[in-house]
Amino acid sequence: MTLQQIKEIYSRPLTELILQALEIHNKNFGNDIELCSLKSIKTGTCPEDCKYCPQSGHYNTSIEKHKLLDKDSILAEAKNAKDAGSKRFCMGAAWKHIPKKDFDQVAEIITEVKNLGLETCVTLGSINADEATKLKQAGLDYYNHNLDTSREFYPEIITTRKFEERIETIRNVANADINVCCGGILGMGESLDDRFNLLLELLQLPAAPKSIPINTLIPVKGTPLGDKYTNAQIDSFELVKFIATTRILFPQARLRLSAGRENMSLETQTLCFLAGINSIFYGNKLLTENNATVNSDNFLLAKLGLKSNAELC
């Protein structure tokens, strides 16, 4: 696949693009929606300078900071997520690298969440090959490490971590036989070509991502992008076309509509489902920002006749 071929797919008429994406989607997945829950297990004071992130220690934001939560409180959240219908429990920690003093505790938490009957996913920053192997042994199913944007636009967003470092972490994850969860953020001021190049980078990863989070910018006051923009710099039709293009390129990946969904109308979300989305974060909160409410999600899924994984088990 080349950049020009990706452009040609995206440039098709919207209805034609959605129809092809829907056919591919139904062939590989059918009518089910994967429900995942996300918990911030360590919040704030991150040494990275990601311009979109309220957890960066470089910016003055109003988030509540906390060190690594204790195991019991995390397990209680995981149990609640399972009872609410989530299939996967995702845990995020605002680190550049996981500290050695916290590694064993995180591994133990992964094991105990797995023992609850949930799939496990973590995002802990960069990890080396040995750490990836140990996380696999602990029972980790997925490791999330987003590329965020194209290689070309990346220096405009982050300067404290090189793009190639992200690729190396994904390589370590794949070599440990952990499923790769990797996507990006739209609406940060990037060009269309940057979005196409992000897709090309995802296609060229050391292992094909099994899960692709598609985020739209949530402008948070105090962050450089939050002070620059009042909303994500992408309209609904561009988002839907990007999702449909992603579905065509990644027929067997779960596409997750992630950050920014709470700002989308039910009609826009419906178009996203038609274009290939088959996974959402379920619960009223993401890491530090609000998510679409559970009541709203239940209403929309019922209205569309979509079934969650929990209902199909």
Curated annotation (Swiss-Prot):
Q: Which InterPro entries does this chain map to?
A: Aldolase_TIM, BATS_dom, Biotin_synth/BioAB, Biotin_synthase, Elp3/MiaA/NifB-like_rSAM, rSAM
* Catalytic activities: (4R,5S)-dethiobiotin + (sulfur carrier)-SH + 2 reduced [2Fe-2S]-[ferredoxin] + 2 S-adenosyl-L-methionine = (sulfur carrier)-H + biotin + 2 5'-deoxyadenosine + 2 L-methionine + 2 oxidized [2Fe-2S]-[ferredoxin]
Reported function? Catalyzes the conversion of dethiobiotin (DTB) to biotin by the insertion of a sulfur atom into dethiobiotin via a radical-based mechanism.
Please state which protein family the record places this protein in: Belongs to the radical SAM superfamily. Biotin synthase family.
Pathway listed: Cofactor biosynthesis; biotin biosynthesis; biotin from 7,8-diaminononanoate: step 2/2
What EC numbers are recorded for this enzyme?
A: 2.8.1.6
Recorded GO terms, molecular function?
Answer: 2 iron, 2 sulfur cluster binding; 4 iron, 4 sulfur cluster binding; biotin synthase activity; iron ion binding
Keyword presence, Ubl conjugation: no
Whichever gene encodes this chain, its name is bioB
Cited HAMAP family: BioB (MF_01694)
Q: Tell me where in this chain the Radical SAM core domain is found.
A: 28-258
The record lists the lineage as: Bacteria, Pseudomonadati, Pseudomonadota, Gammaproteobacteria, Thiotrichales
Organism annotation: Francisella tularensis subsp. mediasiatica (strain FSC147)
> Could you tell me the Gene Ontology terms of the biological process aspect for this record?
biotin biosynthetic process
The positions annotated for binding [4Fe-4S] cluster are 46, 50, 53
Cofactor note text: Binds 1 [4Fe-4S] cluster. The cluster is coordinated with 3 cysteines and an exchangeable S-adenosyl-L-methionine. Binds 1 [2Fe-2S] cluster. The cluster is coordinated with 3 cysteines and 1 arginine.
> Where does the chain bind [2Fe-2S] cluster?
90, 121, 181, 256
Subunit details:
Homodimer.
Q: Point out the signal peptide segment.
A: none
Essential cofactor(s)? [4Fe-4S] cluster; [2Fe-2S] cluster
State the disulfide connectivity: none
This protein is called what?
Answer: Biotin synthase
Which UniProt keywords are given for this protein, alphabetically ordered?
Answer: 2Fe-2S, 4Fe-4S, Biotin biosynthesis, Iron, Iron-sulfur, Metal-binding, S-adenosyl-L-methionine, Transferase
